[in-house]
């Protein structure tokens, strides 16, 4: 099932028992964030949370942990809620192959129901803002899909970026913006080189697939809307934003339009990040908000970030695994699977066959130089093709049985990494590491690896038989 907006997805979550409505009065701080944080501590099938009785707010509707379980992630893709995570990743990869699917332009977007413009813009009157961690420097929009265009090629649909970035509210019509090292940063650099402001649209409360693709590491000229269509199995609905003329999701709850002011900076942060650590305050670009459009009684969606696991890890797990898999397979068809579930792919586990000795290390180095790897992928573990990278006991076995640190651990100094990586020194620069836990092949003949003790041929048949017998007994 393809969802056109957040509300229809929340309805499905409720029908599937994956939405918990909390009607008792709660405090905006610390209750909202603490409740969302708690979902990551009660198991892999925790529900989304909906609050409609928040002290100090009039008529607020707040949704959290919308993608925060494998059950919810499966439902977002239109799969049964009990679909195992590895099958979700495999289905994600199959749908990727349908890319591109052209979007469907629609009129009468629901977010056109209400408007604030110019001096009347007051974000505090529209959004029920609260801090997510007690050390945050202010209020954040952290689950927005931000739309920008390449100033040198404004009409190229593929170069129109839709991405998730952290945004601090610093005034009624001012935002501090952290572009990280992604596509919007390139757009901003090009605009500032010309001395121009960069138009921008910030969309809040989007359909569940749009939220997934906005955090997906895609090539610069690949359209997130066309990828959303592939994942949905139907064209993604878009509409034209009235001020910028940008293509924005048709079903958003709120659309904020304005400009990133050229060469202006303000202190942004600190903010508790997906790394499980705060990133300190830095001078960041400033957005001047010129128009806000929003639905009647908008649902404000927010994303808790902190020590894993939490919603962020479910949201950006599969959508990081699959692009890396596709990019690596384009050059190394021997690659079998990629597990990039951990901290948005700062660590990656790759299973691969080998053409010859040293081949696995080459795959690891290529992973570090993919579009996503340049800013993330700081540690790569390589395992044989018969080791499941999603099965951590198998991975630990491969590392313990096959790794000789002298020959199988490679450390490469002074490579790029995103500034938010807490281990970077200085910010944006880090050593990176490859651990080759594969079995050596000629001409690499190190070690004493006899014929491996593999599963008996009948094991898979017996596993299925035992599962049937157990199910029948229950």
From Swiss-Prot:
Lineage of source species: Bacteria, Bacillati, Actinomycetota, Actinomycetes, Kitasatosporales
Enzymatic reactions: vanillate + H(+) = guaiacol + CO2
GO CC aspect terms: cytosol
Induction remark: By vanillate.
Keyword Nucleus: no
Role this protein plays: Involved in the non-oxidative decarboxylation and detoxification of phenolic derivatives under both aerobic and anaerobic conditions. Phenolic acid decarboxylase that catalyzes the reversible decarboxylation of vanillate.
Species this chain originates from: Streptomyces sp. (strain D7)
Residue positions binding Mn(2+): 161, 182, 224
Cofactor note: Binds 1 prenylated FMN per subunit.
EC number(s) reported in the record: 4.1.1.-
Residues the record lists as binding prenylated FMN: 161-166, 181-182
Additional remarks: It is not known, if phenolic acid decarboxylase forms a complex composed of VdcB, VdcC and VdcD. The term subunit is often used in reference to the operon, however there is no experimental evidence to prove the existence of the complex.
Full protein name: Phenolic acid decarboxylase
Source domain of life: Bacteria
Keyword field contains Flavoprotein: yes
InterPro entries from the UniProt entry: BsdC, PAD_UbiD-like, UbiD, UbiD-like_C, UbiD-like_N, UbiD_Rift_dom
Active site positions: 273 (proton donor)
Family: Belongs to the UbiD family. YclC subfamily.
MF-aspect GO terms: 3-octaprenyl-4-hydroxybenzoate carboxy-lyase activity; metal ion binding
Gene: vdcC
GO biological process: catabolic process; response to toxic substance; ubiquinone biosynthetic process
Keywords per UniProt: Aromatic hydrocarbons catabolism, Decarboxylase, Detoxification, Flavoprotein, FMN, Lyase, Manganese, Metal-binding
Pfam families the UniProt entry points to: UbiD, UbiD_C, UbiD_N
Needed co-factor(s): prenylated FMN; Mn(2+)
Enzyme class: lyase
